[in-house]
Structures are given as C-alpha cells and as structure tokens.
C-alpha cells in the first residue's frame, strides 16, 4: 500500500479546528485488506497510543474519509472588527478665563474710590490694627507697610519688598482730604459776586479821587509859595 490513507492540511490553515474529511472512492479498495488482517495488527489494549490508532482505523472502515483539497489561498481568516472607542463628549464647558488681577500686597487694601489703604497688626496691642494711611498706588501703600513692619518686628518681618529696606527711601506721601492748590488772587476777584465787584470798583474810584485831590492841594501850595517869594523880592 503505497498510497497514504489520509493527509492533513497544515494546522496553520485551520487554527483551533480539526481538519474536515470526506469519503474517497479510492479508499474502498483498502477495505478488504484491513478487514482480512484486522486480527493480526500488533495493537495492545493497555496502550493508549495503540487505542487511538485502533479508533482511527475503525472509523475509517465504517465511514471512509479523506481530506478536502483545500488550498491555502481559499482559507481566509476573518478580520477582527476594530473596536472604535469614542471618547465621551465634554458636557461641561471650559471655565471662562479669569480677568487678570493686580498683585496683592501684604497689608494693603483697595478702597472703594480707587485709593489704597495700608494697615498693620501690632503684636504689642494684642494684634490690634494700626492705620498707616491712604496712598495713591498699591506700591506706595506696600512700602509704608514694609517700613512699619520692619520697625515692629525687625528681620523677622514678612515684607513685600525686602530688597528695598536698606535703601533709605523717603516715606510715601499720604492722600489727605485737602490736597488742592490755593486759588490765585486774580481768579478770586473774577469769581466774586457782582456786589463785591461793584464795591471794589467804587473803592478804586475813591482812591483815585483822593490821590487827585492831594495832588491839587500840593500844586496849589507850590503856587502860593512862588507868589510869596516874588512879593518879597519886589519889596526888597
């Protein structure tokens, strides 16, 4: 018997499965040979491998089988569907960008009208607040706080500008209630009431009349003196 009983396709073409067989017409010619010499086969009952061979031969006699002529190109592995992961949409909107804020200095508070107040807690007075003043800018108020804190706590003080302590800068100017310049005299006379302006005009006129009368008196006195001297010269 030169023809093999069965052939299998390579296992790679059938991953995870047994090969499929069908009945072959040429196999029927082997049946008399197998049936006549069935009892002469050297198979042992207590050998597991012999029992496997026995089972295969028995099935071949009862059914008859041979593998299909599958080509490697006909067998195609199923493409695995790609899992599409959809990221959940963001339900919450991005937080709105905060408006930029100025730097917050230690001991400085912004007043409702736009100025900046400086204050400090005095440890000698059980942490009571000490008012340092109101300033035009937050930097001036921070400098005022630094100077007061350095006087109270020395090198242990937490400062806004520690690098400016040794510069001996002048004290920042506080904002006071009366910082307006005094009005000029000319502008005061222009902004006065009509009665005051009439009174000022009358005063100027009276002063002019008085000066004129004085000049007339002086002129008359000079003329009398000249006439007296002439009379004396004629008599002599």
From Swiss-Prot:
Keywords on record: Activator, DNA-binding, Ethylene signaling pathway, Nucleus, Plant defense, Transcription, Transcription regulation
Basic and acidic residues bias spans: 201-213
GO biological process: defense response; ethylene-activated signaling pathway
GO cellular component, one term: nucleus
Subcellular location per the Swiss-Prot or TrEMBL entry: Nucleus
DNA-binding annotation, residue ranges on this chain: 104-162
Gene Ontology terms for molecular function: DNA binding; DNA-binding transcription factor activity
Biased segments, Low complexity type: 183-192
Chief localization: nucleus
Known tissue expression: Expressed in roots and at low levels in buds and leaves. Highly expressed in cell culture, especially during the exponential phase.
Task performed by this protein: Probably acts as a transcriptional activator and may be involved in disease resistance pathways. Binds to the GCC-box pathogenesis-related promoter element. Involved in the regulation of gene expression by stress factors and by components of stress signal transduction pathways mediated by ethylene, that seems to depend on a protein kinase cascade and to be influenced by methyl-jasmonate.
UniProt note: domains: The AP2/ERF domain binds specifically to the 5'-GCCGCC-3' motif. The affinity of this binding is higher if the seventh amino-acid of this domain is basic.
Family, per entry: Belongs to the ethylene-response factor family. Class 1 subfamily.
Stated name of the protein: Ethylene-responsive transcription factor 1
Species this protein is from: Nicotiana tabacum (Common tobacco)
Lineage of source species: Eukaryota, Viridiplantae, Streptophyta, Embryophyta, Tracheophyta
Gene: ERF1
